[in-house]
Amino acid sequence: MSPARNHLRAALSLAAASARGVTTQVAAQRGLSAWPVPQEPSMEYQDAVRMLNTLQTNAGYLEQVKRQRGDPQTQLEAMELYLARSGLQVEDLDRLNIIHVTGTKGKGSTCAFTECILRSYGLKTGFFSSPHLVQVRERIRINGQPISPELFTKYFWRLYHRLEETKVDLAVVEVGIGGAYDCTNIIRKPVVCGVSSLGIDHTSLLGDTVEKIAWQKGGIFKRGVPAFTVLQPEGPLAVLRDRAQEISCPLYLCPTLEALEEGGPPLALGLEGEHQRSNAALALQLAHCWLQRQDHHGAGELKASRPGILWQLPLAPVFQPTSHMRLGLRNTEWLGRTQVLRRGPLTWYLDGAHTPSSVQACVRWFRQALQGRERPSGSGPEVRVLLFNATGDRDPAALLKLLQPCQFDYAVFCPNLTEVSSTGNADQQNFTVTLDQVLLRCLEHQQHWNHLDKEQASPDLWSAPSPEPGGPTSLLLAPHPPHTCSASSLVFSCISHALQWISQGRDPVFQPPTPPKGLLTHPVAHSGASVLHEAAAIHVLVTGSLHLVGGVLKLLEPALSQ
């Protein structure tokens, strides 16, 4: 590797540490040496993101790292070195008044609620989260807005430094993976910490039980720093309790949102779904604690209630939410989580659920949304379509089985690629997997779905004769499976082609210039297109991967890419 390339990698490591697939363990194993901070070259936003993408670890090297596990503590030591290369010390982070949040599901929504609540007090907020949905600059937000393309281009290798230079009053920092050895855990003195709902995810890195995962999440606890969590299963909650005692961290269990609402009007949430109430309850406690520890007035009047004990954990105080808190909860926006886009006859339901528990919550939300929908006035049928992909070490068969009760008429699978060739869009590039891997994975998803569909003996609404093999220009990756099964599933080579088939030109915003050649080569695609074209309403659930949801949003909401 040339000195210039090594130089650039060192300078960008801090900003890229939480990007897809890259870990400080990888960088530490490569032994990058220290270099002075380089002068920023003149470049456009996409050029900056492409340069940042050079730090994504390729799939082959990731496999090597999995086989040769090193000491995870070296990741944090390496992270401190990379921070120093950017011109900062760990002590500089102490001045950011950080709220540090981890969890398996809901941590992003909790952070969004918390940031919006405190911004409603007139405080200047910073927000670091991952992954991004459409553009990488979404990961750094000042006062709720993603950093501009111009500023990202200027500061893209010093993103933490960017927070320091804007002199924010506080920073809400979302953990990337786990907690104990996550790159964000170089934070030494947060004001308060939070743990959202726990579940099974990233098992190759965090462990294969919820208890092992809870130990990792509890790694963000700090001596003397208050921490809050929501009600968890007894096993992982006991692990969090023991971890807190070991570190001398005061850990509290959040009361329910109903307890905070008692005696006042209901709290309106900007995010849909019953599961968001747990995230909102945690966010209120984090904001309340931060305001108290910063001696900020207006933290909310405590209610007359005796503190309780549950599972040997003290309950956090019950207080009356202030008008600022109510405003913050109501105004919270968090794209790609229980999000609904209504476009003519099409309604897109977007939720980046990717764990069993979060998919269960997604299914409840989707079914409730359908129950409360307005009936279409047209004479055609109502059609339900699933657009799904899953990545990493997640069990797609288990996730797809949870989605069966939604009674989809059609299941569509595609990789997290917006276009067949996404080289022109650096924000959507992912070098941590190969193209062959993602296409094979989609075919496996289809096979799992067909097997589940056959088990359920669902009526075949999309029957078609056995197809002839598609031509070389076909956009469908696989013909019908040779064995007898439901014909209600298709695989497309990218998100754009999947959306074109699902929408049939009926989405007023998503209007590709011309349908790609071969879109209807497959007999099932041809027969299904007629049904979709005549449907009075089409309900599309997009789930399984935040990256899939991000790619869909990029195409359905072009303004997000501006």
What are the roles of these predicted feature ranges?
Residues 170-171, 183-194, 198-199, 264-410:
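Nucleotide phosphate-binding/pyrophosphate-handling subdomain across enzymes
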